[in-house]
Amino acid sequence: DVYKRQQSSLLRDRSFDDHSWGERLSRCLITLGPSFIKFGQTLATRSDIIGRDAALALTQLQDNLPPFSFSEVQAIVKNDFSCPVEELFSHFEKTPMAAASIAQVHCATLIGGQEVAVKILRPNIDALFERDIKLLFWLARLLERFFPKTRRLRPTKVVEVFSETVKLELDLRMEASAASELAENFSNDKDFKAVSYTHLR
């Protein structure tokens, strides 16, 4: 019927492989926010789903967003440690050295004089991520329902793996644990320097 012919035509449409289509998708994902930027990076590894040229375009997707304000940083630190920034740090750079989709990093100096880099999650990132994941699952199920040929690509499984990966990234304790293990494994290697983590409380 007409509907099935439209489905077949869409799945064969070479626009799915156009680099320009990938660039438009990249801009769209940036507009949608942090979760979708991360998802775009995942899609960049799945040329079997979006096409080689589009995947190549998405590799240019930068995990880089405007930073959130220093007042928000202060509020987060006070909420997490029950004290203001000034009681933990003798110096704290107001402008982050890097701002990505999930967190941003500030250079700072502890009261004791140790120079550190402080990684802070974006405000409400957990809630935003949970909301966006629900939308991605809905879109994946919609794709599988109305475009049966995509089922072999397992869109819902792609979203599931993506969800679990980002959940790990949102838990900075996992990152600290992995870095500590790496430092321990290379403790006897003079040519390797691993980042050490300082627990404030």
Which role fits each region the language model picked out?
Residues D1-L200:
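Broad phosphate/nucleotide-binding scaffolds in NTP-utilizing and phosphate-metabolizing enzymes
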